Regions:
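Ordered alpha/beta subdomains of enzyme catalytic regions
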Residues: 150-439, 452, 464-467, 471, ...
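Glycine-rich beta-to-alpha transition loops that act as phosphate-gripper elements at the mouths
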Residues: 263, 325-327, 513-521, 540-542
Length: 674
């Protein structure tokens, strides 16, 4: 039993043995083929020579004709000599059996079989090519039919990934070269276990938020190589060295024999404890590596970054994701919006992300909107329908009236809050925007001068809207000293409300103040230390680019083959892997706080509530402690079960993952919230 603690790194009492990777043995399939050949030779020893020789020669031709079908369809010899079909690819079985019947018929006819062995003509070659094309079409139809049958049987499959670029070819070249080498060596079907994990928490923190599971399952659910994929691979220098039968093998490949165990999306996770555990044929699970890392690495890093911003900002502040324009590419922008929302942000400015994932969208206007107004002549439609249905024929005139009332009390305000003259073009811009959005008027007040122009102009428009039954939303600050400006802005609004009275300016001092000036964790800490009056933060660059740490560093390591643990050794102790197929559990204290994550070998006893256990770090012998858990929660769920698809009990909705993230962080001890 081996454990990974949250911060003390205390881990369990039963040791893993260290295994040196053994030489790859010949595959079970190869062994069965040898047994099959011996059985044929044995049975043929009683056959007249004239009968046996044609059988051997015709069998060679038959093997060549069906080999491609065997690899594409997943057909292999059984101990009894009959074909064995694996996974969803149950194709061409009747055709293979027909070849067996032909061979038996040839044996019975004796020497007549020689007439079937001749030099191939061009017509023969064309026929062979036609047969190959038909076989491919038949294989694809059979796979599609099998998948449909799986769905009809109640299995749950997900749609394709939201990014169309996520295909089987979204991988590194060496995944394909390894898959070919496995296939060429006959070891591609060995049962392997891989684990996806990371070695250190990001941002020098003490926790990580797991994200990207839904996209990972979408990829696994639809994993396949298309004919177009294969044609491209054949055209590459790497593919030129590969046999055609291997490409047929790829065309028949899917995740029907793969099982995926995972921690829950949105949960807090820790180093070394697997996020995903994949079990399946060696070549298949190897081919999944790069894509899964791509889907999980950035998602988890971004969700963690968002959660850290939420912790610093506090639970009451509104967090708005504004990072699309600074994101690293289109998918980086959309993914950032999605996983920022999962990590605790409230809304995004990204409209496409809102459409795809149901995230609330928010936004106001830019400086360019204010700059585009050169005066009152830019306000073309002055009419505004009031909240009660009456019509204000000249809303700009009402705004100017309110500005005069503000100027009348200007000298009664605190000295440093008095203004001299506002920018008329800015006032016209605010007025036209309020005409368009009377229910959602939030003004960017720092185009010219926050205290001398922006705030007085905002108040004039807000007071005019109030008279017509509308309530202004607030202001946005996008430059300057945010702590100072937010506090002076709140003081300005309170002065106006006090001097005009609640009848005219009720709740004006309570409008929202939003800040959006290159904000990141350190800025939020500084604002909290110096005090501020900000209600909402718009955060972009530092959130979506994860400027403080650009990558999480997830890895995908082989830990077991055919039931035998495998280990990766290194002079760098941090890169030594923990061998064997493992389960994980989270132990909780009596107060409901998470204490430690425990890893055990599959098949070992599950930790029990109330039973003392020694927990020990996997690499640091001195880090150990006894733990008596009040609650034990399994970490891994079987989320993908081959032909059965995605477990119906797995809730992959974004809202569920978001709520889980919040609850999981709430359960952490204070020393982990760093």
């Amino acid at each position: 039993m081996i454990v990974r603690s949250f911060s003390a790194h205390i881990l369990s009492d039963a040791r893993f043995e260290t295994y040196i990777p053994a030489r790859a043995s010949r595959s079970t399939a190869s062994s069965r083929r040898r047994q099959s050949s011996r059985s044929i030779a044995s049975s043929s020893s009683q056959t007249p020579r004239s009968s046996f020789e044609p059988l051997a020669r015709v069998r060679t031709r038959a093997d060549a004709r069906v080999r491609a079908e065997d690899h594409a369809a997943g057909v292999f010899a059984r101990d009894d000599g009959r074909p064995r079909v694996r996974g969803l690819a149950r194709v061409r079985v009747a055709r293979v059996e027909a070849h067996v019947d032909v061979e038996r018929a040839i044996v019975s006819r004796g020497g007549r079989a020689r007439s079937h062995i001749s030099t191939p003509t061009s017509r023969d070659r064309e026929t062979a090519r036609s047969d190959e094309r038909n076989n491919r079409r038949g294989s694809r139809r059979a796979r599609a039919g099998a998948r449909s049958a799986m769905l009809d049987a109640g299995a749950r499959r997900l749609g394709r990934c939201h990014n169309a670029l996520v295909t089987a070819l979204l991988t590194d070249t060496y995944q394909l070269t390894m898959a070919y080498a496995y296939w060429r060596n006959g070891t591609h079907d060995r049962r392997a276990v891989f684990e996806l994990f990371f070695r250190a928490n990001p941002f020098q923190g003490e926790f990580t938020v797991f994200a990207g599971l839904e996209e990972a399952l979408r990829f696994v659910s639809n994993f396949e190589f298309t004919e177009r994929d294969v044609e491209y691979l054949k055209s590459t220098p790497v593919g030129e060295n590969m046999e055609d039968e291997f490409f047929e093998f790829l065309l028949g490949l899917d995740a029907s024999e793969v099982r995926v165990y995972a921690q829950k999306e949105g949960s807090v996770v820790f180093p070394r404890v697997p996020l995903l555990r994949l079990e399946g044929p060696l070549a298949t699970v190897q081919l999944l590596e790069t894509t899964l890392l791509c889907l999980v690495n950035y998602a988890s890093l971004l969700a963690t970054n968002a959660a850290r911003h939420r912790l610093v900002a506090g639970q009451n502040a509104m967090l708005l994701e504004f990072g699309l324009r600074r994101a690293q590419g289109v998918d980086g922008g959309v993914s950032a919006s999605r996983y920022a929302y999962l990590g605790g942000f409230d809304a995004t400015s990204n409209v496409e992300a809102g459409r795809q994932f149901g995230i609330p969208i928010k936004g106001t206007h830019a400086h360019s909107y204010v700059q585009s107004h050169a005066g009152w002549g830019c306000v073309k439609n002055p009419k505004l329908v009031a909240a009660d249905g009456s019509v204000c024929e000249d809303f700009p005139a009402l705004v100017l009236e309110k500005m005069k009332s503000l100027e009348a009390i200007r000298d009664d305000m605190e000295v440093d809050l008095r203004w001299s003259e506002t920018n008329t073009s800015e006032l016209a811009a605010f007025t036209s925007y309020a005409l368009a959005f009377p229910n959602a008027f939030l003004a960017l007040v720092d185009t010219y001068n926050v205290l001398q122009s922006g705030l007085p102009n905002f108040c004039a428009v807000a007071l005019a809207l109030r008279e017509l039954g509308y309530a202004a939303v607030g202001i946005r600050l996008d430059s300057g000293d945010l702590s100072y400006l937010s506090k002076r802005s709140r003081a300005f609004l309170r002065n106006i409300e006090r001097l005009l009275g609640t009848k005219i300016a009720d709740n004006l001092s309570a409008v929202s103040i939003t800040a959006s000036n290159d904000i990141h964790e350190e800025v939020l800490y500084s604002l909290r230390q110096h005090g501020h009056e900000i209600d909402a933060f718009g955060i972009g660059t530092h959130l979506v680019t994860c400027l403080k740490q650009p990558a999480l560093g997830c890895v995908y390591k082989l830990v077991e083959v055919d039931g035998t643990p495998r280990i990766k050794l290194s002079e760098d102790i941090g890169k030594v892997t923990i061998p064997g197929c493992k389960n994980g559990y989270r132990l909780f204290s009596q107060t409901g706080e998470a204490i430690v994550d425990v890893m055990t070998r599959v098949g070992e006893p599950v930790p029990k509530v109330g039973e003392r256990m020694l927990c020990r770090h996997p690499f640091m012998e001195s880090k150990r402690a006894y733990v008596v858990p009040s609650k034990v929660a399994p970490l891994f769920d079987l989320v993908w079960d081959g032909a059965r698809g995605v477990d119906p009990q797995v809730d992959l909705s974004l809202e569920t993952s978001r709520a889980r993230c919040k609850e999981s962080i709430r359960q952490l001890r204070a020393d982990h919230l760093r």
